[in-house]
Amino acid sequence: MSQNQETRGFQSEVKQLLQLMIHSLYSNKEIFLRELISNASDAADKLRFKALSNPALYEGDGDLRVRVSFDADKGTITISDNGIGMTREQVIDHLGTIAKSGTKEFLTALGQDQAKNSQLIGQFGVGFYSAFIVADKVTVKTRAAGEEADKAVLWESAGEGEYSVADIEKKSRGTDVILHLREDEKEFLNEWRLREIIGKYSDHIGLPVEMLTKEYDDEGKECGEKWEKINKSDALWTRSKNDVSDEEYKAFYKHLSHDFVDPVTWAHNKVEGNQAYTSLLYVPAKAPWDLFNREHKHGLKLYVQRVFIMDDAEQFMPNYLRFMRGLIDSNDLPLNVSREILQDNKITAALRKALTKRSLQMLEKLAKDDAEKYLKFWKEFGLVLKEGPAEDFANKETIAKLLRFASTHNDGSEQTVSLEDYILRMKEGQKAIYYITADSYVAAKNSPHLELFNKKGIEVLLLSDRIDEWMLSYLTEFDGKQLQSITKADLDLGDLADKESETQKQQDKAFGSFIERVKNLLGERVKTVRLTHNLTDTPAVVSTDNDQMTTQMAKLFAAAGQPVPEVKYTFELNPEHYLVKKVADIADETEFADWVELLLEQAMLAERGSLENPAAFIKRINKLLG
């Protein structure tokens, strides 16, 4: 029987909040249960802390738990706890106003030193109102620890701007939250649906969550019901890593990620200091199918004192590490009004920095300890890691060590060569790391620009991923060595360059008039025309200057629908090649023009993989062959 009943209006902020809740402030409805179980966990934590100095508050019942039940006929779900409970004044303050769930005031009252150990969560206390996402009426029955049974409180609201509060009798300490579900939310009146949600969100809180289960006699006949713990209530990451087996880590990864394959590696760390947190990070073995989809969700699971707050907390990991899986569990993270969107602040930034460093250390260790495993990882996630130099300047050198490339040192197209490997094999006097970018490994491997390097035995990295050119615009040096494209017209081999011979000087002089004829013929279509002594088997190539956009970068711009600046090539001719010698001797201007055009088109085709007018090219070949 209720007494001393009164009806009150919600604080104006609460009215706004309820409207947001009812219209799905949260991204999915089922988290109402997570929030209410989280509140029950709060209540248990508060009781544990206060009972340290006043054990009588346990009232002979120190086995704290939360119980979830439902009544399909009445259309209700009840979440009950035997935690700290609330007085009438606390109910009015905490359920009638926003940002006063009690946790923040509780911490202030205790003082910061004690609060460090209190394991309390939340700053805003809006989780309770999430009940109105699925309920058109909410009833709360609560009695504060240490109060008489007739000092309990009844609170009810339909979420429409006001609530009622009255005195009732309640024998047991704690709080019962009864949700009267909307007609279209009856899917939650199902034991297995509730078990699924509890397993998903509350498996690893440090409080048993119980549901009623049927009991059967020896003959298999139903003989009653009993409360059964349905969550693990054992946060694996809070245990010492020395007490967790590899199999447990692997099983937890699969539980966490819903992956069927064992992870490649993992790291479990507990950090204390200005920020106290625990992280458990995993490197998956296989890339998800939508890894490069912009809508792909990624990030870590966020827990606050073992209470699951959100999936895909991307604030803690840079985009180029979006393949990392795992969790972070912290007690002092600030949360916004919905507890699903982290505030952008110094704590978040510091955690991101630390977790990024930890992830890169994991990959460094894997590469060092098990090269074969690392190469398997690279095949799955290498393209993503190549985004790193552009995104993370502070860790650029570390990321660069993790990159792998195909190379002229090896026969196959597999990307197995690190920049450190390359430097160890550099020629005496070599000052740069040389590379070439192309549309494919085959195109890079057979580029005429490689001829001189093959002749001198200088290793060249063969880059054919679309992202490579963009990556190299940010990764310009490593370990004090410049990364240099061999397709540049102003390529400088330094001490490795051949000294100009007397023969070359004579050739330059003899072909002077020929070069002028070609310049006059091509005019503004090329930047310049010159002889080159860097080719062995090819008559001509085109190249760009260092200050010009490369061919591959221009292709990236075009593929992205961006305007592409005009690229004017330097046309380089090999005076040792019989075709160039033949063309130089042609007197007829028409025939001369056809042959020069053919040499230019061949060079352009080798460089770009396509021509603006392939029909004219074919026609010219047929004409000269006829």
Curated annotation (Swiss-Prot):
Q: Using the UniProt record, give the first listed, main subcellular location.
A: cytoplasm
Chain spans, region C? 556-626
Q: Provide the residue span(s) of the region labelled B.
A: 340-555
Q: Which GO terms describe its molecular function?
A: ATP binding; ATP hydrolysis activity; ATP-dependent protein folding chaperone; unfolded protein binding
InterPro entries, from UniProt?
Answer: HATPase_C_sf (IPR036890), Heat_shock_protein_90_CS (IPR019805), HSP90_C (IPR037196), Hsp90_fam (IPR001404), Hsp90_N (IPR020575), Ribosomal_Su5_D2-typ_SF (IPR020568)
User: Which cell locations does it reside in?
Assistant: Cytoplasm
Keywords of the record = ATP-binding, Chaperone, Cytoplasm, Nucleotide-binding, Stress response
Q: What are its GO cellular component terms? A: cytoplasm
Annotated family: Belongs to the heat shock protein 90 family.
Which purpose does this protein serve, as stated in its record? Answer: Molecular chaperone. Has ATPase activity.
Name the record gives this protein: Chaperone protein HtpG
Gene name of this polypeptide:
htpG
